[in-house]
Amino acid sequence: MNKFIILALFAVAAASAMPNYPPPPPKPYHAPPPPPHHAHPPPPPPPPAHYGHHAHPAPAPVVHTYPVHAPHAKCGANLLVGCAPSVAHAPCVPLHGHGHGYPAPAPHYRAPESDSFDQFEE
């Protein structure tokens, strides 16, 4: 109990010994002045790190088109080249429908029936 009283007296003495200054007044906020009109732009940011490799310029984009449109195809006849070259008439209208020239999909197979395995059991 004596220790508690001594600690309480010590805390009161320490609190009363501290100076009681008033808090400082808050500083007024002022926005920074705008930059003059002849100010230089900020420098560009440094290039990103390449982890020890030298920086290489990016390649130019590749354009996968022809510089001009293809001429209109004549629908009169096509030259078929083979063992015996010949000329065959080609239609001017493309054929649409019937799967667009692709074969039918592969058929689905049924699962084996259970009685096919019964012949092996005795």
UniProtKB/Swiss-Prot annotation:
Gene giving rise to this polypeptide: 15a-3
UniProt lineage: Eukaryota, Metazoa, Ecdysozoa, Arthropoda, Hexapoda
GO cellular component, one term: extracellular space
Main location as per UniProt: secreted
Biased composition (Pro residues): 21-49
Keywords: Secreted, Signal
Signal sequence extent: 1-17
Organism of derivation: Aedes aegypti
Location of the region described as Disordered in the Swiss-Prot/TrEMBL record: 21-63, 103-122
Family, similarity comment: Belongs to the vitelline membrane protein family.
Tissue specificity field: Expressed in the middle and posterior regions of the follicle cells.
Places the protein is found: Secreted
Ranges for domain VM: 69-109
Coiled-coil regions listed: none
Protein name, UniProt field: Vitelline membrane protein 15a-3
